């Protein structure tokens, strides 16, 4: 992990959460250079918290979901970002690539804001309306329109760029959008698992962490993206569980559902605490699993012992287990 030499400056950007000075123009050709020059935040793969991990394992056991995870039917990543420069991660099957239905629409969202920032597309009122419909209502027609406008290869290049690394073959994949959300031909399936719309919980969590720390395009774009992720119109999975059992939670989310595949992802804020939760399931009961799971994850974040770890020494944090080797080509 690189030294965090400019963390104070980065924190000021995070806390401001608003417009900053004139941004350096970032084009596709300069993404890697921008990543090298950007403030260095902790890497999530180096931030596993053994207390949070033990708690997650216990919650899955109590919910009867540990065996589902062992069989690869459930994958979860939880990140406590209450103190954003000290993220703490717990996960099960974090790097398992799964079909994610509409969840990868967040990749189209990123692509649109990046392309507008690069001066290659206008972020006008119509575009913002389509993006909001794509995220809040999970509109397939809006997603297809925006994917075709931004460009399939552009989105894929952004996801695989050195700046974002949200799809990395060495990390067993990640976010992938290789087909329109319509009855149209596949553009390109993901190189490892042949999925049209795929994700791993860990890379989805990284997407949200990058957003929370002002690193998706720029601070202004991050703020606008968060607005679009807020006020979800579909009230199932994470939203259902939190609305019933943890009212007052601010939820910024994107979910996905198709057949037996259920996925949800969110930034959740309440009472001064903030966390990222991502869960993906392949089971007819997966939607119910996720509604119950989010309440258990919320309990972990608000557990007094977890709160006590906010500013403890780093001896409770360790590198995550490396992802499985990608399948042979």
Task: Show where each model-derived region lies.
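Structured C-terminal helix/loop/strand segments within mature extracytoplasmic catalytic/sensor domains
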Residues: 23-60, 206-207, 212-329
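A short, well-structured edge-of-sheet supersecondary motif
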Residues: 55-93, 269
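Acidic helix-start/capping segments at beta-turn-to-alpha-helix junctions
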Residues: 72-82, 125-139, 149-152, 174-176, ...
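Mid-domain, small-residue-enriched loop/turn segments at the edges of structured enzyme/sensor domains
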Residues: 146-213
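Short, well-structured active-site flanking segments
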Residues: 114-132, 218-221
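Flexible glycine/proline-enriched surface loops and loop-helix/loop-strand junctions
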Residues: 90-94, 137-142, 184-192
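Bacterial N-terminal signal peptides
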Residues: 6-16
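Active-site SXXK
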Residues: 97-121, 134, 277
